[in-house]
C-alpha cells in the first residue's frame, strides 16, 4: 500500500503539494469515492483513481501516445528547432521521456514517448519482429512487382540492406508500408528505389498500438493499461 500523494506525484503530472490541493477541492476519487486525505493509502496495482473526472493510469513508467505533427523533431532537445517534448506540459517533460524511434521532421503520426527503456529497446529491435505501419502518398506508380520486391527484401543503390517488408497498394499514388526495422529514412528510401518518391508520410501503428483517430495533430494522451499490456506482451515482457 502506498500514499495517494506519492502515487499521483510519481506520474509526473502533479507535485505532492498540488495533489493535496486537488484532494481538498474534491477533485480526486479512489475507487469511486472522494479521497479524504492526500495521505490515504491505496494499492496502485488495483485502485481506480480519477482526477477531475479523468482516469489516471498508475504505473511505474509513463507511456504517452503523441500525434506528431510535421515540422517537429523526434528528439529530446535541440538548440535550434522545436522538439516533440516541447509539445508536452512541464510536468511530463520532467519525467525523462524519450521517443521510441524517430520520425523524420516532415513525417506525421504515431509517436510513443516513454521512460521505459527496456520496452523501447525491444520495440525497435528487429529481433522482436514488431511491425511499424506507415501510410504514404507518392509520386509515381506502384504495382504488384513492387509489392513482391518489398516482400523479398531488397538492397538499395546506396548499399542499404532491407529486410522483407509489406507493401499494400491503396489506389493511385498511395500505399501502406509495414516494416519490422527502422533504419534512417527507410520508408522513403525504399519507395524512392522503386521509382515512387514520397511526398507525404504518416505512421499509423507500432505493433498493437494504433494511432487514436480522435487525437488531433500535436495532441497526446496516456496509454491505457490495456495498451501498455499489449505492447509489453508483443515485446516479450
Segments predicted by a language model, with ranges:
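Basic, flexible Lys/Arg- and Gly-enriched helix-loop patches that mediate nucleic-acid binding at interfaces
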Residues: 1-237
Amino acid at each position: 500500500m502506498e500514499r495517494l500523494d506519492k502515487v499521483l506525484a510519481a506520474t509526473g503530472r502533479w507535485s505532492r503539494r498540488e495533489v493535496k490541493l486537488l484532494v481538498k477541492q474534491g477533485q480526486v476519487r479512489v475507487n469511486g469515492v472522494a479521497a479524504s486525505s492526500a495521505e490515504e493509502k491505496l494499492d496502485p496495482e488495483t485502485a481506480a483513481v480519477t482526477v477531475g473526472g479523468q482516469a489516471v493510469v498508475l504505473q511505474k513508467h509513463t507511456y504517452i501516445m503523441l500525434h506528431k505533427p510535421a515540422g517537429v523533431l523526434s528528439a529530446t532537445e535541440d538548440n535550434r528547432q522545436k522538439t516533440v517534448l516541447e509539445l508536452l506540459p512541464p510536468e511530463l517533460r520532467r519525467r525523462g521521456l524519450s521517443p521510441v524511434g524517430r520520425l523524420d521532421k516532415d513525417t506525421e503520426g504515431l509517436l510513443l514517448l516513454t521512460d521505459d527503456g527496456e520496452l523501447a529497446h525491444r520495440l525497435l529491435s528487429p529481433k522482436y519482429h514488431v511491425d511499424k505501419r506507415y501510410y504514404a502518398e507518392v509520386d509515381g506508380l506502384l504495382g504488384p512487382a513492387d509489392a513482391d520486391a518489398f516482400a523479398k527484401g531488397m538492397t538499395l543503390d546506396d548499399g542499404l540492406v532491407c529486410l522483407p517488408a509489406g507493401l499494400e497498394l491503396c489506389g493511385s499514388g498511395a500505399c501502406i508500408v509495414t516494416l519490422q526495422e527502422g533504419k534512417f529514412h527507410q520508408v522513403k528510401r525504399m519507395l524512392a528505389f522503386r521509382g515512387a518518391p514520397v511526398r507525404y508520410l504518416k505512421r499509423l501503428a507500432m505493433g498493437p498500438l494504433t494511432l487514436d483517430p480522435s487525437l488531433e495533430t500535436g495532441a497526446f494522451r496516456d496509454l491505457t493499461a490495456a495498451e501498455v499490456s499489449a505492447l509489453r506482451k508483443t515485446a516479450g515482457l
